[in-house]
Structures are given as C-alpha cells and as structure tokens.
Amino acid sequence: MSIKKRKPTINSQRQYSVDDKEDITTTDPERSLLEPLPNSGGRNNQGRMTMRYRGGGHKRRYRKIDFKRRDKDGIPATVKTIEYDPNRSARISLLAYADGEKRYIITPDGLEVGDTVMNGPQAQAEVGNCLPLTSIPLGTKVHCVEMTPEKGAQMVRAAGTHAQLTAREGDYATLELPSGETRLVPSKCRATVGTTSNVEHENVVLGKAGRKRWLGRRPRTRGVAMNPIDHPMGGGEGLKSGGHPRSREGVPAKGYKTRKRNKESNKYIIRRRTESKQGTGGQ
C-alpha cells in the first residue's frame, strides 16, 4: 500500500492524500457477517447529546470480527479475501476454516490471500497465528492482545500498530505498547503475531472538511468563540485568549493528569506512556 497525493488544482486538493487500496482484493463483504449499524448522532438512549460534533457521514454496516479465536484451536483456516472495513483503520481478512465456517479477523501486515493461519497453543509463532503469550517467543511483535483471558482482543488493534513481548515471569507477561507504556498482562491471554495492516494510515491527510463529514464528524466550535455560559473560555470584549486552556467541563487541557490515582489496574503498569508518544489531537 502507498499514499497518493493530488495535484493542487484547487485548494481542497492541495494537502489531500489517500491510500491506493492496492491490498484490497474485493469490495463485496460476506453477507452472513454483516450487521446493521444505526447512527446515533452522538445521542444516548434517552435522545440526549452525550458527544458533541458527531452526526451524518456515510451509512455503514458492521462487520463481525472474531476477536477471541478460541473455539477454533487446531483448525486451519485459509485467507480468502482482504477487505476494507469502514469501522476501523486496519484491513480485515475473511478466513475460511476447514470445518466450513467463515470469520473475519484484523489483517496483519504481510498476510496474503491463500495463506493458512492457525489458532491455539500448538500453532507456530508466525504472522496471523493467534497464540497464548506463554507460547510466543520473547521479542516477538504482536497485536490484538487480550487484557483478560477469554475476553477477546482489546489492545493494539489500530492500523500499523504492534506491541512487543519483552519478558515473562510467573503468571504475567510484560508488553511494551505502542503508546510507550510497559504493562503486565496475564500469560494466559492471547495475541496475534505480527503488526496490523495499513501501516501508511498515519500518513494520510484528509485535506478538506468534506472528508471529515464523510466520517461522521461535524465542525468543532472553539471555546473562545462561545459565550461564557457555554464554555469557561468564552466571553470577553473583542478577541480574547480565554485564559488557561480547559475543556467545557473546566478540566485543564495542558498536562493535567485525568487518570484516577487509585485505579485498580495501576498495579499492572510498570512504566507510564512516554510524553513523546502521547497523541497531539486528530487531523
């Protein structure tokens, strides 16, 4: 996969870039693995807005992804397709198991149509195979990592990401996450070998407001442009800075730690995420 840029014939094309999607083999998803995906528009079940600046966007259908892969131990599966999923940044692959069942998984980088993947403790530590952390050699790059055994993959699922297995001691394994955080995970948890696909995703520049609307994101109003009743940074005569940057709820925006001091999972964190790898906001 590579990034394509447009000629700056108009301003909206000047910074515009898009991936060429050469790795996608079909545009027809497996119908048996599709579900309706209603658009909430940022509202909860009472109709009240709980997330601002959401709504619109292209209609989607949810692809059911197998994040557990535990009930197919020892059954080989063949990769039939590599597909685009509008609900996530990574590609997905359709697996056809030897028993006739079909399932989607997140595609690892380097996996191709026709390859065979396996699940379970007896599987080899090869790209696309899902194994317990006890069966994976130290130093291996993994993705789709469970945090609780049998709960399914919860970490390292975005495009172009991987965690590295650095140590094992007792009932826990040590993982270095993409954020820079070093964390303990139960050794019985499973992970998939390799790096997630679509590694160039971070280099895509939306380039224009319309592409953001296609994704279901509405324009975001600055706090300093609001009235003081609507935002702590609002009000003032003329152009004002708004004072110390903070959210609508008054939480400081620069360097203020929002994680609970006595959170139960603190004991599993060996080293907090590094400042250089913390996000700086969306595009």
Curated annotation (Swiss-Prot):
Keyword annotations from UniProtKB, A to Z: Ribonucleoprotein, Ribosomal protein, RNA-binding, rRNA-binding
Record's keyword annotation contains Transmembrane: no
Domain of life: Bacteria
InterPro entries hit by this protein: NA-bd_OB-fold, Rib_uL2_dom2, Ribosomal_uL2, Ribosomal_uL2_bac/org-type, Ribosomal_uL2_C, Ribosomal_uL2_CS, Ribosomal_uL2_dom3, Ribosomal_uL2_RNA-bd_dom
GO CC annotations on file: large ribosomal subunit
GO molecular function terms noted in the UniProt entry: rRNA binding; structural constituent of ribosome; transferase activity
Entry keyword Translocase: no
Pfam families on file: Ribosomal_L2 (PF00181), Ribosomal_L2_C (PF03947)
A Gene Ontology biological process term: cytoplasmic translation
SUPFAM superfamilies: Nucleic acid-binding proteins (SSF50249), Translation proteins SH3-like domain (SSF50104)
Annotated spans, Disordered: 1-59, 222-283
Similarity comment: family membership: Belongs to the universal ribosomal protein uL2 family.
Function: One of the primary rRNA binding proteins. Required for association of the 30S and 50S subunits to form the 70S ribosome, for tRNA binding and peptide bond formation. It has been suggested to have peptidyltransferase activity; this is somewhat controversial. Makes several contacts with the 16S rRNA in the 70S ribosome.
Subunit relationships: Part of the 50S ribosomal subunit. Forms a bridge to the 30S subunit in the 70S ribosome.
PANTHER family, per database record: LARGE RIBOSOMAL SUBUNIT PROTEIN UL2M (PTHR13691:SF5), RIBOSOMAL PROTEIN L2 (PTHR13691)
Protein name in UniProt: Large ribosomal subunit protein uL2
Organism encoding this protein: Salinibacter ruber (strain DSM 13855 / M31)
